């Protein structure tokens, strides 16, 4: 599933091509995604300009003249900017036309989303799917020891494992399964440790690790396990840098202990039992 780094890589790839351009047409090839694609987009969007492209968590937010187009890549979605003359591919679901350019959502499993939030309904932060998201890891709110304090305060009295606490995204957004395992390893925290038992020093190390790992992942173009490619069609390369993820039985890159694997909440977790003592 594309997580924050993959979505940010996508944003960085499409923004230079689309910002300032006017939509000439919208084609809904198959609108049966996680939620139905609003049919009226074919009438609402043409003539509107893309004034900016932001990211909130795993959502891309295209600011148009009268509202925001929200795009979620789901499990296997990708966005690419292509010449409008290129033929559609199987699993292309929605296209936004910009004259000779086309933005295409390719989503084989149809778990993605294309939604619309009119500005007349208030700021985009009031959109129901964005209301409960935690802070952005690269925002000023999460910088320095502010991030540590957010993790410490939101984890109090929480018996859930720290990995699942991070995955929930209510403290800080974007720390998906791969990046949870890597961040917890870098911080030296066992993934099954109860979130409520995290100390302030541990929260400080974890906040720093989250920012560091996500930054490295973005610089590497994200992670490509099966389907993810960037807006140019290239895979991400973060997987070659992982220290624990998908390395079961291989020696830890720090202490040489074989990497362990367990399942938490139906998600596979990787860790070093020596570097991350419970």
UniProtKB/Swiss-Prot annotation:
One term of GO molecular function: class I DNA-(apurinic or apyrimidinic site) endonuclease activity
InterPro entries: DNA_glyclase/AP_lyase_DNA-bd, DNA_glyclase_Znf_dom_DNA_BS, Formamido-pyr_DNA_Glyclase, FPG_cat, MutM-like_N-ter, Ribosomal_uS13-like_H2TH, Znf_DNA_glyclase/AP_lyase, Znf_FPG/IleRS
Keyword Signal recorded: no
One Pfam family cited in the UniProt record for this chain: H2TH
Catalytic residues, chain numbering: 2 (schiff-base intermediate with dna), 3 (proton donor), 58 (proton donor), 267 (proton donor)
Any coiled-coil regions, as ranges: none
Co-factor(s): Zn(2+)
Keywords, sorted A to Z: DNA damage, DNA repair, DNA-binding, Glycosidase, Hydrolase, Lyase, Metal-binding, Multifunctional enzyme, Zinc, Zinc-finger
Reaction(s) catalysed (UniProt annotation): Hydrolysis of DNA containing ring-opened 7-methylguanine residues, releasing 2,6-diamino-4-hydroxy-5-(N-methyl)formamidopyrimidine; 2'-deoxyribonucleotide-(2'-deoxyribose 5'-phosphate)-2'-deoxyribonucleotide-DNA = a 3'-end 2'-deoxyribonucleotide-(2,3-dehydro-2,3-deoxyribose 5'-phosphate)-DNA + a 5'-end 5'-phospho-2'-deoxyribonucleoside-DNA + H(+)
Gene3D superfamilies hit by this protein: 1.10.8.50, MutM-like, N-terminal
UniProt: DNA binding residues: 91, 109, 158
Zinc finger map (FPG-type): 243-277
Cofactor note: Binds 1 zinc ion per subunit.
DNA repair keyword on record: yes
One GO term (biological process): base-excision repair
Enzyme Commission number(s): 3.2.2.23, 4.2.99.18
Family per similarity comment: Belongs to the FPG family.
Quaternary organization: Monomer.
Role this protein plays: Involved in base excision repair of DNA damaged by oxidation or by mutagenic agents. Acts as a DNA glycosylase that recognizes and removes damaged bases. Has a preference for oxidized purines, such as 7,8-dihydro-8-oxoguanine (8-oxoG). Has AP (apurinic/apyrimidinic) lyase activity and introduces nicks in the DNA strand. Cleaves the DNA backbone by beta-delta elimination to generate a single-strand break at the site of the removed base with both 3'- and 5'-phosphates.
NCBIfam families reported in the protein's UniProt record: fpg (TIGR00577), PRK01103.1 (NF002211)
Protein name: Formamidopyrimidine-DNA glycosylase
Native source species: Polynucleobacter necessarius subsp. necessarius (strain STIR1)
Gene name of this polypeptide: mutM
